[in-house]
Amino acid sequence: MEAFESFVAVALEAEGLVVSSGVKFPVRLQTRRVDRVEIQTHGYEVDLVGARADRLILATVKSALGSRGVVAEHVTGETTNESARKRYTLLNHPEIRRKVISEAGRRYGYRASQIELRLYVGRFAGPVEGVHEKKIRAWARTKRVGGGPIRVFGLGDVVGSVREAASHKQYRDNQVLVTIKVLEAAGMLTQPLPDNSA
């Protein structure tokens, strides 16, 4: 599990979900061959899978911290940069999206209406103007996947959930939560943790 994925996993656990990382779903697709029909199976990886009795979350996680950030055209697939578009295939390729949702439901025993597709972003491109974030969120709201639209979560959403989880007094041996507690104890956090004595 990558570092930012660890933060997202804590946020998902805070929703009462059991979280697993790096799950591949096989998808059969017709190749582009013109001389004959050829079907190939490829595994499409979902970064994090969160599950509880009534819901299954398939999460694509892109930190993009230390880089330009997540670009709207790459997520939506409206780019000539094939490599960048492929990083978001699960989101921007309707047939693959549909087949992954179907396979996840079959594998784990969920109806499509119980499955949610999410995008977690550490840094959106152009954060000052917020243009890319707005475009991505607007695009995602129009995509019906499983039980609803693709949901988009930014760094603030993730950190808010993680800080809330870290505020509880019960100790959990989790690197992310302990890091937050250490930084607070050292006076390095600019905002104090919420007071949750429970």
Regions found by a protein language model. Give the residues of each.
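Intrinsically disordered, low-complexity Ser/Thr/Pro/Gly-rich regulatory segments
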Residues: M1-A198
